[in-house]
Amino acid sequence: MTYITDLPAIQDMAFCLGKEGCLFITLCAIAERITHKPIDVLRSARELINLKLLDYVEENPSQHLKEAFFVKDRDLVLAYLTGIKGITTLKTHRLSKTEKRPYYIRYATETVPPKTHFVLPDYSSLYHSLTVENGTIDSYYIIVVPKKEN
């Protein structure tokens, strides 16, 4: 078990997660829906940072917000969060109206560089996102969970 005191500078980490962690939070939400179990977002983030699957600058993290919580490998992060090996993500620009698999959406603005925000069809980590309001749907990411072997 990881105690709160085992998480160095947790307030800095929570700040960065709030500013730049929408994809990671969205992946946690998907993992919770797949496993039907709650995820401790901060502890999971720390473990994934230690595994080098999330970017995070320990020293003065608020000065490195753009690097904070960049997800290096969505599939490995989902596998870690769900405990399911072989889980994959398919990127598409069109989504079938009959799609049954879990998916999330990437919104992007046309600014340079573009601003992005990741959401579920029925959940966003922000009450109000200017990126969603002013941007457009850039792509969909469908989660493919491998069938269980008997």
Where are these regions (language model features)?
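Noncatalytic regulatory segments and standalone regulatory/sensor domains
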Residues: 19, 96-103, 107, 118-150
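Active-site-adjacent structural segments surrounding the nucleophilic cysteine of cysteine proteases
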Residues: 1-65, 144-149
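Substrate-binding/catalytic groove segments of enzymes
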Residues: 36, 87-89, 127
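Compositionally biased, low-complexity repeat tracts
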Residues: 17, 79-82, 131
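...with weaker cross-activation on analogous glycine-rich loops/strands in unrelated enzymes
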Residues: 57-121
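Low-complexity, compositionally biased segments
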Residues: 9, 15, 43, 58, ...
